[in-house]
Structures are given as C-alpha cells and as structure tokens.
C-alpha cells in the first residue's frame, strides 16, 4: 500500500469582490499517495493555480487543512525546501548561470556538499537528454531544453511531491510530448508524487488520476 504524502482536507478559498463573496474552492478534498501522478484540469478561472498554491504552502486557505503526513518539519518554508518541488510555465532560470549551476542551486541552499550536488545534477540532466548541454547558458538552449533544466532543478532535492503548473504550456506539440515523457520517467524513477495543473487533455490522460475542478470541487474526470 502506498504511503500518503499529501492530504487536502475541506479546503475552501473565498475572496471578497465588492459586496459579494466569491468561492473559488469550496470544501475540497484530495489525497495524494507516494509515486502517484495526478492531473487537474478545469476551465480558466476555476481555481487550479490557487489550489496548487495552497497545496504547495504558498497561500493559505480560508478554511481547511493542508497535511503533509510524517513531516518532521512544522514551518512552511522548511517543508517547501525539503519535501516539495515546483515547476511553472515560466522556467525562471538564472541567465548568467549554466544549466548545471541552475540545477544545483536548491541543493546548495540546503548547505549540502557541492561535489555530490554536481554529480546528482549531472545524472538528472543526463536522464533528461541534456548531457551535452551542462555548461550552456540558458540563452543558448531551446525552449524545450530550458524547461528540462527547470524540471531537473525541481527534482534535484528528491522531493516527495512536485507541483507543476502548466509545465509545458509554452512548448510546441513535439517538444511538449518529449519533455513531458522525460519528466514522468525521472519522477517515477525517484518515486515522486506529481500533481499537475494543465489544459492539455492528452497529457492529463497519461497520469494515474485525472480530476476536473469545477464549482470549487474536484470531481473524477
């Protein structure tokens, strides 16, 4: 039986708009297990990114609990650092750092050994097909290659959970499938849980579970 790595319990997120209360998320529940691949689809403005921000402890719900079972850390910034990885549509690579340097930054922030970080980053970049691009600057890489570097960066700390918000949204169809398949391969190799928000239904159907976010609730799609 898989270990549970994330529980969203009765999550609500409400905003005040004039005299009206807008319910973006409304008593929502989600359980994610170790190694699971979960996709969340929904129309624009349905609250997908809000849900991901709450799951990633980047935003607080109006009501409800975000539970990381068996976490030895209580402070949110430590949970994010040690247990969570993030991938966004915009990769936010540092332009004056090589691909390899961009990937090892999260490991160095934790004060871990640089040689070990370089070794692990090199292996992940190799798994993502970038073994010949380690010392290239981001400006020398294609859009797909830049996104693979961002994916490698999210994986370097071997997070329990990766939260991906439209991770291939800026790529052409060929690059999208190539990057996404490599991403899933490496995530599964590390037994990392992936929760991905996407508008791409083809990618969504490659995941273990598919949910549709509508009217503030998650429904099995």
UniProtKB/Swiss-Prot annotation:
Cellular compartment(s): Cell inner membrane
One Gene Ontology term, aspect cellular component: plasma membrane
Stored PROSITE patterns: ABC_TRANSPORTER_1, ABC_TRANSPORTER_2, LOLD
Annotated keywords: ATP-binding, Cell inner membrane, Cell membrane, Membrane, Nucleotide-binding, Translocase, Transport
Molecular-function annotations in GO: ATP binding; ATP hydrolysis activity
Residues that, per the record, bind ATP: 42-49
Predominant place of localization: membrane
ABC transporter domain boundaries: 6-220
Disulphide bond pairs: none
Record family assignment: Belongs to the ABC transporter superfamily. Lipoprotein translocase (TC 3.A.1.125) family.
Subunit comment: The complex is composed of two ATP-binding proteins (LolD) and two transmembrane proteins (LolC and LolE).
Full protein name: Lipoprotein-releasing system ATP-binding protein LolD
Organism from which the protein derives: Rickettsia typhi (strain ATCC VR-144 / Wilmington)
Gene from which this protein is expressed: lolD
